[in-house]
Amino acid sequence: MPITPTPSDHPHFPGRGKTGLLLVNLGTPDGTDTPSMRRYLKQFLSDRRVIEVPRLLWWLILNGIILNIRPRKSGDAYARIWLKDDPDGSPLRRITRLQAEHVANSLQSNDLITDYAMRYGKPSIQSQMQKLQNAGCSQILVMPLYPQYAASTTATVNDEVFKWALDLRWQPAIRTAPPWHDHPVYIKALADSVRQSVKKNGMPDDLVISFHGIPKSYFVAGDPYHCQCLKTARLLREELDWDKAHFHATFQSRFGSEPWLQPYTDKSVVALAENGSKHVAIMAPGFVADCLETLDELDIELHEEFLEHGGETFSYIPCLNDSPAGMKVIEQIATENLAGWVDTPKKGTVKKSAAKKAVAKKAPAKKAAAKKA
C-alpha cells in the first residue's frame, strides 16, 4: 500500500527531539516613563489571578483611577533602581537573563535550549514558548522562579503556558516545576547569605524575613502560600539556630484596603526601631532576583523609615540572584525536573561564550492547600 505523499501545503516542522527549559519571573516594564508603566500595570493588574474582584467593578477602578494615578508614581520608584547604562534597564530582567545564561553553562547539552520569559512585559511567555518549539523543542520544562507557590504567581505562569498550547495542532510535552520552599539546597543558600551578612555587617539585633504578601482572603480560600512561607522561615531559623525572639517572618507590598497576610513588614520594622532595636538585617527569600520590591521598597523606603524611628544600622541582604549559591539552587531544581529528558553534568565546564550560544535569546536592545509548617 503506497504511502500518502506529503501535501504540497503541509506546514514545515523543524527538527524535533530538543528539550527546552524556560525560566519565568514576574515581569518588568519596558521603561520608567508613564506610557511604559501604564502598559505594564494594565497587563499585571488585569490578571484575574492577581486581582480576584468582580470584573466590571475592577475594570472601573483600574481604568478610571489606578491607571491614571499609579503609572507616574511607580515610574518614579523604578527610576530609582533603573540601570541607566545597561541595555536591560530593569535589574530583574538583567538578573533573570544572567540566570538563564548560567544555567545554560552549567547544564549545557546539545539537546537542551535554555531561555527566559516574563509573565508580564517582555519577553512574553507565549513568544518564548513558540521560539523554543520553533527551535525543535518537543518537550519543555517551565520553571516559575517562585520558591513558594501562590495562585497569583506560579499558577498564572502555568495558565499562560497552557493558553499558548491551547490552539496548537502539535503540542510539545510540557512540565512545570513545583515550588522549592523547603528544598535543602535553597535553605542552605539562604542561611549562608545571612552568615555572610553577619560577617560583613555584624550581628543584628533582629533578623526580618520578608515575603511578598497576598490578600488574606486568598489564603482563606485555600492558597498554600502562607504555609509555605512560614515553613521556609522555620527551616531557615533552624538552620541558623537563631533566637526565636529576634527572628521575624513578615509580609510586604500590600495593595488596597483589604486585609493582607500579617504581620506587615513595614509596621514590624518600625516597631522594632521604636522598641530599641538599633541594628536590623532583612532579607526577602521569596524573590530569586532583586527587583523593585527589594531594592526600593526595602533597601530605600523601609531603610529610611527604620532610621527615622530610632534605628541605626539597616542591613539589606541581597536576593540570591545569579550568585554561585543562587545558581546552585536553580540548577538543582532544574536538573531534578529535567530527569528522564536530559542527561546533565554535575558541574558546568563550558566557557561563557558557549553558554551564550545555548541561550535562545540574549538581552533586549532596550530597555505564588498545603500542610502548615
Feature locations, PLM:
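Active-site-proximal alpha-helix that buttresses catalytic centers in soluble enzyme cores
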Residues: 2-352
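Intrinsically disordered, polybasic Lys/Arg-rich low-complexity tracts
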Residues: 347-373
